[in-house]
Amino acid sequence: SEKDRMYRVLGRIRRFQREHGSVQVKSRWAYAKRLNTELGRKIAGAVAGYAEENHADVIVFEYLETKGKISGRKKQKLHLWRKRDIQKRCEHQAHRRGMRISRICAWNTSRLACDGSGTVVRDPDNHSLCTFQNGKRYNCDLSASYNIGARYFIRELLKPLPATERSLLEAKVPSVKRRISCVYADLRELFSEMELLRAA
């Protein structure tokens, strides 16, 4: 895949840098950056295209802190830069197609299980898989995606409500107060409580 290709290029740069020093590696980093730009363009197009095919109104992203200088190793800089680039390109494409972009707090979306069982344990051999506290095996990215979507819907469900009704729901589902720990299970519980409140 394109992602694997990028990792191979970064591996070759790392080996070359160890053997020849950092001065002679500039052209190789320039190639990696061009490859990164192309990868960002393809991913952004695929995301916007998929959203349009499925008649989505909104594309939800994790909020990335984009102010100030990016610190850290070049590999980390490149990775964060691609995330920013993808979001920016997606935003332009989404607006052209009549869709909105929304961002939610990124904290703990990957660390917490979508079923509300607690923190996940990453598989040491396959980093894309994890184990929930209840023993369930799950895909890490899928669990995080559920949590990202849940945080968006929790915010959108609570925002238009009168203060008294919102406070009542937050008392019944206390976890929705802290957005940094909201998961998909909290959305389901909130929705059930809203249905009961309407039926009363």
Language-model features and meaning:
Residues 1-200:
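Positively charged, helix-rich recognition surfaces that bind polyanionic ligands
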